[in-house]
Amino acid sequence: MKNTKTVLILAAVTGALLLGGCGSEKTKTYEQAGKDLSQGSYKYALEEYQSSIQNGVKLAQSYRGAGIASLRLGKYEDAVNNFTEALNCDNVSKNLRKDILSYRATEELKWGKYEDAMADCQTLGEDFSMDASSYFLTGKVALAMDSYEEAASNFKQAYGEDATYDMAIQIYEAYLDKDMEADGTRYLEAALSS
């Protein structure tokens, strides 16, 4: 009887250690994916995030990571799908939701899905407080849609929130891409005169 209890306790402890080891290994894969993503190893990061998704590890964050890796690899449709899956996960924090929406809008812009990108920008404006990055992204999408006044308004807000040389360069480059260099030059001049 005493031996049976000992065997059962040892079996339970061994089982817990083995299961704990599996969870630890799954977490290590997720953490390695983050490292690979930050180091520019997008292919490896994508594979590791996909493994984390299959294992149910931090689903929203894993889908987000897979989306970013896909974005960097130029797999636009996959990126949008991953960002959408991330948004559909349970218990997505407000900050993470804003981050994912911003990434998805950026991806949709690159993919040429301007209406979808603008819809995400509008959701950002309705559900979250806008910051310089949000205004800039919305301006860039509006510019791509040839909504010049809306773009100008958003760029003005972006520069008002972040009147730095970097923001001026970003706005200038957005206008330059649309052959509207003169519109962007005023931001460069303002940054240089500060």
Q: What is the meaning of each model-derived region?
A:
Residues 38-39, 72-73, 106, 110-111, ...:
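Register position in tetratricopeptide repeats
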